[in-house]
From Swiss-Prot:
InterPro entries: HTH_LacI (IPR000843), LacI/GalR-like_sensor (IPR046335), Lambda_DNA-bd_dom_sf (IPR010982), Peripla_BP_I (IPR028082). The keyword Chaperone does not apply. One of its GO terms (molecular function) is DNA-binding transcription factor activity. The lineage of its organism: Bacteria, Bacillati, Actinomycetota, Actinomycetes, Streptosporangiales. Activity is controlled by cytoplasmic cellobiose levels. Binding of CelR to the celE promoter is inhibited specifically by low concentrations of cellobiose, the major end product of cellulases. Activity may also be regulated through post-translational modification. GO terms for cellular component: cytoplasm. Induction: Constitutively expressed. Residues 9-28 bind DNA. This is HTH-type transcriptional regulator CelR. Transcriptional regulator that regulates the expression of all six cellulases, encoded by the cel genes (designated celA through celF). Acts as a repressor. Specifically binds to a 14-bp inverted repeat site, which is present in the upstream region of the cellulase genes. Its main location: cytoplasm. PANTHER family: HTH-TYPE TRANSCRIPTIONAL REGULATOR GALS (PTHR30146:SF109), LACI-RELATED TRANSCRIPTIONAL REPRESSOR (PTHR30146).
């Protein structure tokens, strides 16, 4: 049987009745082609089953049409925390709509950062989405030195806002909403399991908790504050610490659903009923909260939208549609369930 010849650019041009250069312009997304011609070329591509040569296209456009989503955590944390799933989904959808693909990379140690920096600066990608950064992360400086555009997922700590593009969640507002809910339901010994203080989400959710207490005329008491890193295990340790220091606690705001789930289980193991003895509010509004026992009240943050907006800002930067830094902050809302 004769093997079918692989379709070429010239074959597409002949079928569409246009020149080779016109086909290239359509493939590369140029706006210098009439709508009718563009449709004719697309029909020819579909009919022939033509697949553009990405390597050749890269030589012409000087782009790979690929971006990296870099999560500055280890793999275990990436796949354990529900927050990241929504981000990845939103990024993937938005990039696909613009004809881009992405690679997912993680790294937290110095060696991992060095390896990542070398890869990202090596013209393998057109830009980078940075997620879950800590205060000491070297990746932004590496990208600046290499001239690689990037967008932060979350407002960066210690960086002048006017110099960078980012998409963030209103973490202060979310922390405030959670704490106000506990105040409004009559609780007075309200503790919090805060997130890491080298990350903006951890800092700002704690700030929202504090602001809500002070606005209600209540004291901010350090003995009612313990810290975790958003993981389940850290939530277990933090809740036990709170009960040791303040056994009369009657409510807990946990800065992630996993830490909230940990609080629920530690409270149950200690003989306390939720919400009758101690109310609990989490943060993420993930399936973890929905399927907890009892179902957990939680702050909803639009992670899929966050991923979409991060991708949109980066592609706009890559294609030259925007050159100035853009900053977006997305709103949160409280999903009330049985735990508090």
């Amino acid at each position: 049987m004769e093997r079918r010849r692989r379709p070429t650019l010239e074959m597409v041009a002949a079928l569409a009745g246009v020149g080779r250069g016109t086909v290239s312009r359509v493939i590369n997304g140029s706006d210098q082609v009439s709508p009718a011609t563009r449709e004719a070329v697309k029909r020819a591509i579909k009919e022939l089953g033509y697949v553009p040569n990405r390597a050749a296209r890269t030589l012409v456009t000087r782009r790979t049409d690929t971006v990296a989503l870099v999560v500055s955590e280890n793999n275990q944390k990436l796949f354990a925390e529900p927050f990241y799933a929504g981000i990845v989904l939103g990024v993937g959808v938005a990039l696909s709509e613009r004809g881009f693909q992405f690679v997912l990379a993680t790294g937290r140690s110095g060696i991992e950062h060095e390896r990542l920096g070398g890869y990202l600066a090596g013209q393998h990608v057109d830009g980078v989405l940075l997620l879950s950064l800590h205060r000491d992360d070297p990746l932004p400086q590496m990208l600046d030195e290499a001239g690689v555009p990037y967008v932060y997922g979350g407002r960066p700590l210690g960086v002048p806002e006017e110099q960078v593009s980012y998409v963030d969640i209103d973490n202060i507002g979310g922390g405030r909403q959670a704490t106000q809910r506990l105040i409004e339901t009559g609780h007075r010994r309200i503790a919090t399991i805060a997130g890491p203080q080298d990350m903006v989400a951890g800092v700002e959710r704690l700030q929202g908790y504090r602001e809500a207490l002070l606005a209600a005329g209540m004291e901010y008491d350090e003995t009612l504050v313990s810290y975790g890193d958003f993981t389940y295990d850290s939530g277990v340790a933090a809740m036990r610490e709170l009960l040791d220091r303040a056994p009369d606690v009657d409510a807990v705001f946990a800065a992630s659903d996993l830490m909230g789930l940990a609080a629920l289980r530690v409270l149950r193991a200690s003989g306390r009923r939720v919400p009758e003895d101690v109310a609990v509010v989490g943060y993420d509004d993930s399936t973890v909260a929905e399927h907890a026992e009892p179902p957990m009240t939680s702050v909803n943050q639009p992670t899929e939208l966050m991923g979409r907006e991060m991708a949109r800002l980066l592609v706009d930067r890559i294609t030259g549609e925007t050159t100035e830094p853009v900053r977006l902050v997305l709103e949160t809302h409280l999903m009330v369930r049985e735990s508090g």
